[in-house]
Amino acid sequence: MHACIRAVRFAFLPVLLFSVTALSAQQPGQLPTPKEGDYVSHDFHFKSGETLPELRMHYATFGTPVRDANGRVTNAVLLLHGTTGSGGQFLAPQFASVLFGRGQLLDVTRYYVILADNIGHGKSSKPSDGMHAHFPQYDYDDMVRSQHELLEKGLGVNHLRLILGTSMGCMHSWVWGETYPNFMDALMPLACQPVQIAGRNRVWRKMVIDGVRDDSDWKNGEYTAQPRAALSIAAAMFYVAGSAPLQIQKSLPTRDAADAASEDYVKRFVASHDANDLLYAVNASRNYDPSPQLEKISVPVMFVNSADDFINPPELGIAEREIQRVNKGRLVLIPISEQTHGHGTHTWAAVWQQYLKELLEASQH
């Protein structure tokens, strides 16, 4: 049964948000240290036809897997990050403080929580390791297949209680639901659309891609110094795409404040990104399109977007249309408020944790 709802703005939400945040403010310091490791896939074949002799997948985990009488893992949760991010994004207080503590929804003493760095991201294999523009042209299907291999062969996980993905990870969630429909109990995609990337969403990505390729300092990927002009263009695109007008206006109320913040953001972005890694990460979405096979998804889906998301504007009506094709799908559109953060609302768990709770309850066996 599918449903589409628009979350109402409760009068007590600010109080509730404060209570949750205050209650768990010290949780990150109390969490156990995650176990980090690397799984190496040998002769990994990409959809492009290319092969990588060794594909390194970095991961971090909390907790211990629990198995039923048949050896099936019952408590594993896979968290999937966004473009240019890493599994470490889920250690941010606005996520970990709300979900990982004792008695919270993803209590790491109960769940086996897996934070994986995707191909091209974090500490996993990526162009900047040395192959530069000769690195295989990976896409989202390759990334999901490598996640599946990491789980089964690297961690011995044969089933997931939940996949929760944000932004790019949101899109990966749809691919998971179609490619491995029986591997998980539930899906929670946050901040994306289950269709081909087109319109404004494709335009800004194309501008980032062309900005890198057209920069003479990129040198076909064999640069010795980062192409600063290309990265500055990318910084501008990423800032606008991820921005939340209400939050920015509040924090940058004057022209001087806005100018200073802009300069600081570009400086930090350029210093922390590699042009090839960025190009590959953005270009990986080039053939993403789960829409033809949405009916294959058989598990409960809690699909959450926010009304102030520049990348996925609600006025397009795409989410409302496509969720009707998901048998157990439900759409929640979170209205703009003091608590939303544009596209980045996906990591502010206090805003949407009530829907995670409902999903976990609805998908219990």
Spans of model-derived segments:
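Conserved hydrolase catalytic core segment
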Residues: N158-G199
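Alpha/beta-hydrolase-fold enzymes
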Residues: F183-R268
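Conserved alpha/beta-hydrolase "acid-adjacent" motif
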Residues: F310-G317
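Catalytic active-site module of serine/aspartate enzymes centered on a nucleophile-bearing elbow/loop
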Residues: K328-H365
